[in-house]
């Protein structure tokens, strides 16, 4: 019963659309109706930037921090309390799933990058550092957020095998689940990348 309560709480916490809330409260803008219609930092930046560039950057940074924290902080607390790895990984997946398929938004949501990073920094910090370096490099070169995010995700998955080469394949199942969720949410971006229609944001 305790685990079920934790899982429910984490999903509800992960579902909180901070980007949407911040944009509505501070910029009086509904990002679900503009831009890519995503609730993540990239769409916050893209949409609010048209009205107030300085505010857009602040709100985008705040969105990243809050989306990151809603996964990282609960996991840090649970890890400190010595909960087992199975529960920690379940919590990580649920936090990301909640962000991407929010119960408050009729199971729509963001792309899962910041929340995923928040979860994985607790469980696989070296892999996240590797992914972050790739994200920065690709972002600097191409200036396309989705491309940088997908490249970082690929680097994360590959490095999870390199840094944990002695683990059996089934132990990577949560990583595959998380990667699948994020790739699924990026399918429209992938389509635009293929047809060279994706906008530059970074």
From Swiss-Prot:
Keyword Lipid metabolism: yes
UniProt xrefs under Pfam families: G3P_acyltransf (PF02660)
Catalytic activity: an acyl phosphate + sn-glycerol 3-phosphate = a 1-acyl-sn-glycero-3-phosphate + phosphate
Pathway(s): Lipid metabolism; phospholipid metabolism
A GO term, aspect molecular function: acyl-phosphate glycerol-3-phosphate acyltransferase activity
Subcellular location as annotated: Cell inner membrane
Enzyme Commission numbers on file: 2.3.1.275
Top-tier EC class: transferase
UniProt record, GO biological process: phospholipid biosynthetic process
InterPro entries found in the cross-reference section: G3P_acylTferase_PlsY
Membrane topology: Multi-pass membrane protein
Keywords: Cell inner membrane, Cell membrane, Lipid biosynthesis, Lipid metabolism, Membrane, Phospholipid biosynthesis, Phospholipid metabolism, Transferase, Transmembrane, Transmembrane helix
Gene Ontology CC terms: plasma membrane
Domain of life of the source: Bacteria
Segments traversing the membrane: 3-23, 61-81, 87-107, 118-138, 144-164, 167-187
Family the entry assigns: Belongs to the PlsY family.
Annotated HAMAP family: PlsY
Subunit structure: Probably interacts with PlsX.
Function: Catalyzes the transfer of an acyl group from acyl-phosphate (acyl-PO(4)) to glycerol-3-phosphate (G3P) to form lysophosphatidic acid (LPA). This enzyme utilizes acyl-phosphate as fatty acyl donor, but not acyl-CoA or acyl-ACP.
Name of the protein: Glycerol-3-phosphate acyltransferase
Species assigned in the record: Campylobacter jejuni subsp. jejuni serotype O:6 (strain 81116 / NCTC 11828)
Designated gene of the protein: plsY
């Amino acid at each position: 019963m305790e685990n079920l309560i934790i899982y429910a709480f984490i999903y509800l916490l992960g579902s909180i659309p901070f980007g949407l809330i911040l944009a509505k409260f501070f910029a009086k803008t509904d990002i679900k109706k503009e831009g890519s219609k995503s609730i993540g930092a990239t769409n916050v930046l893209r949409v609010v930037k048209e009205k107030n560039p300085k505010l857009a950057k602040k709100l985008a940074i705040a969105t990243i921090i809050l989306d990151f924290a809603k996964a990282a902080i609960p996991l840090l607390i649970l890890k400190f309390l010595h909960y087992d790895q199975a529960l920690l990984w379940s919590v990580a997946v649920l936090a990301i799933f909640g962000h991407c398929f929010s119960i408050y938004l009729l199971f729509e949501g963001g792309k899962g990058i910041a929340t995923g990073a928040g979860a994985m920094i607790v469980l696989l910090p070296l892999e996240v550092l590797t992914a972050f370096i790739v994200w920065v490099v690709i972002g600097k070169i191409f200036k396309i957020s989705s491309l940088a995010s997908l490249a970082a995700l690929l680097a994360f998955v590959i490095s999870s095998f390199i840094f944990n080469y002695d683990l059996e394949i089934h132990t990577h199942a949560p990583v595959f689940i998380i990667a699948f969720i994020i790739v699924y949410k990026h399918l429209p971006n992938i389509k635009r990348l293929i047809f060279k229609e994706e906008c530059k944001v970074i």
